C-alpha cells in the first residue's frame, strides 16, 4: 500500500511539473545597494526571508535567491562591474538603488540587456522601459497643497540629487499663476552657507519655504534652521518628502513653526502593524538599522521584493519559461545580446497589483506608480498629525480636525515636562546629602521652590535638567547658534527654563518670557576693603586739614589784632593807685594785653576755658566777642563730628561707581562670558559703558569668566585688583555668604528682570505667566527671596554688613590725645628747667655768686621754700632793695616776697 501511494505522489508531481512548465524552484534575483542604505538592505533581507519561509506553499512555490553587491556610485567602473556580475549570475530581475551619478549607467544597461530594475530611488525624468519606480511622484500632491495654502511668494530649496522634476513643475505653475518663487540650489552648501542663506532670506522677510531634498540633506537643513532660530511661530515649511514621520522634528514642536509634509506609509494598517512586530524582534547586530522604525524607503524596498515575488508567481501561472543558462554571456558585448524573456518579465512586472506597506502598488506602462494615496501631515504641539490625504482621483482632501482637549496643557499632564536650569547659588544647588536622593529631590534653592510652585498651579509633572554647558544663553555671532538654556529651549531639548534668566530683546525674539518674577540690575562686586585703622591723630579727622590751618592762622591773627587794638586804645592803659606807705605809681602805665597775654587770651577762649584778664576797651571786646562766636561754632561742629569719627570704623572703597571703573586701569573688571550682562555692555551706546566694553573686549588676560562662581573667586583672589559685574541679586546673595569678603558698591547700572522662559509659541506660556502673577500677588516670591537670601545668610543681619560699623572707643582712637598730653607735660618740664637755669645764672651775676651756688640756692628754695645762706633771701626778680617788714606788692605783674631780718 505504501509503495502504491509513493507512485501516486510521483505521478502527480510529474503531471504538476508538466502543467506548470519548466519554472525554476530557485529564482535568482539581484540586489544593488549604495552607501548609507543599511536599513533598506535589512528590509530586503527580511522580505526575502519571510517569503521563503512562508507556510503557504501556493504563495511561495519557489525560493528567492539574492545576489547582492554594494556599489560605490562615484566609480562608474565599479557600477558597471557590479551590474555585469549580476547579469553573469543569471538573475531574472534586479532590485537596486541609485543616485544621480549611477542612475544613467544602470538604466542604460537595463535597456540594452532587457533586465528589469525595480528601485525605490527617486523617479527618473526620462522614459526607461525596464525601470519600475516604486516611489510615487510628489508633483501633484505638492502643487495641490500650494494651491490650498494660496502661496504666491515662497522660497524653493532643492538639490539635484533627485533631478529637476518638481522644480520644473513648480516653475511652470508659477508662470501660469504669477507666483514669485525664489528657487535656490543648495547642493554644494555647508553649514555656514546654510546659516548665511537663512539670515539673508530673513532680512527679505521670507517666511514660507518648500524644501525638496533627500533625507540626509533635509535633516541638515532643518538643523540649521533651528540653529538660527527660524523654527518659531510665523514660519511655514513644506517638506517635499514621503516620510514625514522619518524626520526628526522635536525641536520644531517647541519652536512653534508650521511644518507640513507627506507620509506614504500608514503605520495603522494591519499589514504595517504586523511587520512592525516582526521588525522589533530583529537582532540589531545582524540586521543593522532595525533599532529604528523602517523609513519609507525601507518600506518601498520591502514592497519591491513583494512585487518581484508576485511577478514570478504570475509568470509561473502563465507557464512562461524564464529559465536561463548559468552563464548569461558578456554584458559588454557589442552588439548587446539582450535576454530573450526580458520583455515578458518587464510586461508582467508592470501588470502586478498588490497591497504593500506603502498602500496600493500599481504601475502604468511607463513603470511609474499610479493609484496611490499619500497622507498629508502637519506638526502639532503633540507631534505629527494627519490633516488630510491626496490621490489622483480625489486630489487633496482635508479631514475635519478631531475634537481637541480643552487646553493644550491637558496633553502635557500625561507626560513629564523638562525644566532646564543652571547650577547657581541660591537659585539651584545640590543638597548636602544629594547622593541619597534621586530626580528633583537632589536639588534645592529659589528656582527649585519656584518650579514646584508653578507646577502646582498649572498641574504638570516636571523633571529638572541642568544645562550641560553651564551657560545662560547667547547667540554666537559667527555660527548664529544659541547656547545655554536659551539653546535648550530653541532646539527643543527643554520646555521650560526656570532660572535667573534675564529678559532681553534678543532672547524674546526666539523664546517667550513670563512676567518678571524678580527685578534687578547690573551691579559692581569688589573685594571688601580692610577696615582702616585709626591714626594716632584721628581726633583731627572731624575737620579737614585746610580748616585746621585756617584755625591756626585765625588764632594768630586774632591775637595780633587784640594786641594792636590794646596798644592803640587808651582804655587798655591804666595806672595803679599806690597803697598807703608805698611808693607812687610807675613811670609806665601798665597794659595787660602784651603779645603773650594776647596769645594766652585767644588760646583760653578757643579752649573754652577763659583766663584772668579781659579786654577793657570797646575795640578789644569786639575782637574778643567775634573770636568767642567763632570758637563756639567751630568747637560745636568739631564736637559733633568727633563722636561719629571716633566711634565708627570706616572702610575706604577704591571704587564707588561705574565711572570710577572706566577712568582707571589699575583695577580690572569683567562679566560673565555668556549672558545678558555682557550683551548689555556690547550693545550699550552710553559713553561710559562703551569705554568699559572696549576695555573688557581687548583686555589680556580675558576678563570674562565661564561661570559666576569663577568670577567671584577671581574677585576674592585678586587682592582688590578685580571687579566683577553681575546681577544685583547675585551680588547681594554672595555678600551674605562666607567668608563675607565681597561687597556691592554703587547703584545698579540698569533695571531689568528675571522671567520664566518657554519656547516660542508654546502652549505653556499662558499658564506659566498666570502662575507667576498669582505667586507675586500672594507674596510667595518675596517669601522665597527672604528665605534664600537673608534667612540663610552667613554674615549676620543685613545691616551688619554695611559700610560703617559703630563700635566702642579703643585706645587707638584717642592715642593722639594722650601723646599730646604727655608731650605737653614734657615740654612744660623742659621749659621750667630752662627758666630755672636762666634765672639762676641771672641771680648769680646779680648777687655775685657762683653759678653752682645760685643753682643750689634756687633748688633749695624751689623744693623747701627756705631762705638762702647767711640769711639772704633769693628772689626771682627784685630790681629794687627790699624794705624791712613783711609786705606784698605788685610790680609789673611780679610778686616780691620780703621777710623780717634780724
Curated annotation (Swiss-Prot):
- The record lists glycosylation at 52, 56, 258, 371, 407, 414
Q: Spell out which residues lie on the membrane's Cytoplasmic side.
A: 566-592, 612-617, 835-902
Instruction: Indicate which residues the UniProt annotation says bind L-glutamate.
Output: 500, 502, 507, 676-677, 727
Leader peptide range in chain numbering: 1-20
Question: According to its UniProt record, where is this protein located?
Answer: Cell membrane; Postsynaptic cell membrane; Cell projection, Dendrite
Q: Which residues are annotated with the PTM Phosphoserine?
A: 862
Which keywords has UniProt assigned to this entry?
Cell membrane, Cell projection, Disulfide bond, Glycoprotein, Ion channel, Ion transport, Ligand-gated ion channel, Lipoprotein, Membrane, Palmitate, Phosphoprotein, Postsynaptic cell membrane, Receptor, Signal, Synapse, Transmembrane, Transmembrane helix, Transport
Q: Which segments does the topology annotation call Extracellular?
A: 22-544, 639-813
| Family matches, as InterPro entries | ANF_lig-bd_rcpt (IPR001828), Glu/Gly-bd (IPR019594), Iono_Glu_rcpt_met (IPR001508), Ionotropic_Glu_rcpt (IPR015683), Iontro_rcpt_C (IPR001320), Peripla_BP_I (IPR028082)
Enumerate the CDD domains for this protein: PBP1_iGluR_AMPA_GluR4, PBP2_iGluR_AMPA_GluR4
Regarding how it is modified after translation, the entry says: Palmitoylated. Depalmitoylated upon L-glutamate stimulation. ZDHHC3/GODZ specifically palmitoylates Cys-611, which leads to Golgi retention and decreased cell surface expression. In contrast, Cys-837 palmitoylation does not affect cell surface expression but regulates stimulation-dependent endocytosis. Phosphorylated at Ser-862 by PRKCG; phosphorylation increases plasma membrane-associated GRI4 expression.
Domain commentary:
The M4 transmembrane segment mediates tetramerization and is required for cell surface expression.
Question: Would you identify the family this protein belongs to, as annotated?
Answer: Belongs to the glutamate-gated ion channel (TC 1.A.10.1) family. GRIA4 subfamily.
Task: Sum up the protein's function in the record's words.
Answer: Ionotropic glutamate receptor that functions as a ligand-gated cation channel, gated by L-glutamate and glutamatergic agonists such as alpha-amino-3-hydroxy-5-methyl-4-isoxazolepropionic acid (AMPA), quisqualic acid, and kainic acid. L-glutamate acts as an excitatory neurotransmitter at many synapses in the central nervous system and plays an important role in fast excitatory synaptic transmission.
Question: What is this protein called in UniProt?
Answer: Glutamate receptor 4
Q: Which organism is it from?
A: Mus musculus (Mouse)
